[in-house]
Amino acid sequence: MRTPLCDDLGIEFPIFAFTHCRDVVVAVSKAGGFGVLGAVGFSPEQLEIELNWIDEHIGDHRYGVDIVIPNKYEGMDADMSTEDLTKMLQDMVPQQHLAFARKLLNDHGVPTPEGEDNSLKLLGWTEATATPQVEIALRHPKMTLIANALGTPPPDMIEHIHAEGRKVAALCGSPYQARKHADAGVDIVIAQGGEGGGHCGEVGSVVLWPQVVKEIAPVPVLAAGGIGSGAQIAAALALGCQGAWSGSQWLMVEESENTPVQQDTYIKAGSRDTVRSRSFTGKPCRMLRNDWTEAWESPDTPDPLGMPLQYMVSGMAVAATHRYPDQSVDVAFNPVGQVVGQFEKVEKTAAVIERWVNEYLEATEHLDALNAAAGV
């Protein structure tokens, strides 16, 4: 399973794990992969605490940080401080959206304590809020990769990260976006197929991956969207990718912050139980279909706002997901890909890595046997 990217980053397997849980970051990197901590939702102070903890527990291994700077969002042209931008965006959020969201949660028995529900907070989603996160991440020597989940990072940010001796990655959903990343100097492009969890495009992985590989060669490409087994990693590498970027699987490990009730929801779900919805972030995001996503699709309810305004509304549901995980299942923010249909049990992180490696070997041995039988 070793690719040139493994030597580049000093890892054993080209398995990249996106997660918001620091324990999973550490467990993946210690098992030979590369853990990546999602920074959205963390204040600068909270992010510093998380990264310090990772540094203390990860040993000599390396990890990355994922930020979100969309190429289009409300207020992106405003030249102002983070505080002023937050105030401007808060004033743009209609009260009817906040009232609707709060009622939806309350109707499902989920408390929304005044001042503690995370509404109207701007915890990421803009260059102004992501820049401090990058600066904090760069203060940690074991942090060797910054990934942008939406769009091409600003040129000065790419230059700054490179000057600090770190690499830059960015997700894409089309060859056009991949070309923009490569031309800007991004080191690694992550091709996210439409079946992936979280923000994704409409093109399926098996179609997208080779298109992106061809478009930006020799820039290394990571395959994302539909990665839940070693056989799927084998398919990605066969299509020219140098590794796999995964997210959904790490919701189903023992080190995850998810409760058994939340994980049971994933086990019971099928691949057709996910939906691309704008109801949480303002951009199409694949997640489990539930009462929250259904409510925002109704013709007699408010339309989702653009990014980051919608998240300033849905933040109360995200906060409830963490504070009252078992009570909020029907209205929770559950970004997950169609690969959810493969989940059967909760495993240790190291066991997942080991299983994927063995499944990869089985898949490649199967192809070798076919070739041998054909006299190739």
Predicted regions and their residues:
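Active-site entrance/lid segments in N-terminal catalytic domains of soluble metabolic enzymes
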Residues: 1-216
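Glycine-rich Rossmann-fold phosphate-binding loop(s) that bind the pyrophosphate
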Residues: 17, 224-225
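Conserved active-site-proximal phosphate/metal-binding subdomains
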Residues: 81-98, 202-222, 228-376
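Residue-level detector of alpha-helix initiation sites
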Residues: 152, 227-228
